[in-house]
Amino acid sequence: ICGGFIALHDAFTRMISAGKMANHPIEEELAAVSVGVVDGEVCLDLPYVEDSTAEVDLNVVMTSSGKFVEVQGTAEDGPFERKSLEEMLDAAAVGITEITEAQRSLLSTPPVERAN
């Protein structure tokens, strides 16, 4: 999702530069992270080893303004408390804020032109 957002932004920027579009349709950045509970602790951006043993596994997609686009999760090892969900969503929001800030910084530079 994060890479797709960058590619889409670059494509729109190129279309504007080529005169095929007048305005950039993207209103804000979009990013996604995985978050879960491993050994009772909330973990952000789970690598495979942690993901494969997580008690709870969530994928969260948010905008840079903190609005949710998607929350998808599974209780892998039995039901979990609402408090755990809130902690995971808070951790996801922190991670997504970092990613969208990096996207904003990256996208402030012109896209790399490729040779045809």
Spans of model-derived segments:
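Polyanion-binding surfaces on beta-sheet-dominated domains and ring/shell assemblies
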Residues: 1-116
